[in-house]
Amino acid sequence: MSFRPEYKEYFKQGATARIYNGAFEDAGFYDEVDIKEFEYSREEKTFYYPCPCGDRFEISLEDLRNGEVVARCPSCSLIVCTVYEAEDLEKYL
């Protein structure tokens, strides 16, 4: 399965961040991904998920514990919204 067509289509849409009542609404996320779908590195204490550009989205355990939801790809401008509950992180502490 290739993400390339979706990847190109994403940029054609011209996604932009919007703020509604102080919260992000469709902040240009490429996708929403459940934390259970991420791969976890105990050494780096970081979660990884494949990016369509060939690299990986990443978000640290510390960021998640601080309420962050944005996982970023270091090679391109895509971001995903990480979906999780506090109890999902307990096994990684």
From Swiss-Prot:
Pfam families recorded: Zn_ribbon_CSL (PF05207)
Cofactor: Fe(2+)
Protein name per the record: Diphthamide biosynthesis protein 3
Catalysis: reaction(s): [3Fe-4S](1+)-[protein] + Fe(2+)-[Dph3] = [3Fe-4S](0)-[protein] + Fe(3+)-[Dph3]; 2 [3Fe-4S](0)-[protein] + 2 Fe(2+)-[Dph3] + NADH = 2 [4Fe-4S](1+)-[protein] + 2 [Dph3] + NAD(+) + H(+)
Cellular compartment(s): Cytoplasm; Nucleus
Keyword set includes Cell membrane: no
Pathway: Protein modification; peptidyl-diphthamide biosynthesis
UniProt keyword annotations, A-Z: Cytoplasm, Iron, Metal-binding, Nucleus, Oxidoreductase
GO molecular function, one term: ferrous iron binding
Free-text domain note: The DPH-type metal-binding (MB) domain can also bind zinc. However, iron is the physiological binding partner as zinc binding impairs the protein electron donor function.
Family affiliation: Belongs to the DPH3 family.
Subunit annotation: Component of the 2-(3-amino-3-carboxypropyl)histidine synthase complex composed of DPH1, DPH2, DPH3 and a NADH-dependent reductase, predominantly CBR1.
Residues involved in Fe cation binding: 51, 53, 73, 76
Source organism (scientific name): Encephalitozoon cuniculi (strain GB-M1) (Microsporidian parasite)
GO cellular component, as recorded: cytoplasm; nucleus
Biological process annotations from GO: protein histidyl modification to diphthamide; tRNA wobble base 5-methoxycarbonylmethyl-2-thiouridinylation
Designated gene of the protein: DPH3
DPH-type MB domain residues: 29-85
Record InterPro entries: DPH3/4-like, DPH_MB_dom, DPH_MB_sf
Cysteines joined through disulfide linkages: none
Reported function: Required for the first step of diphthamide biosynthesis, a post-translational modification of histidine which occurs in elongation factor 2. DPH1 and DPH2 transfer a 3-amino-3-carboxypropyl (ACP) group from S-adenosyl-L-methionine (SAM) to a histidine residue, the reaction is assisted by a reduction system comprising KTI11/DPH3 and a NADH-dependent reductase, predominantly CBR1. Acts as an electron donor to reduce the Fe-S cluster in DPH1-DPH2 keeping the [4Fe-4S] clusters in the active and reduced state.
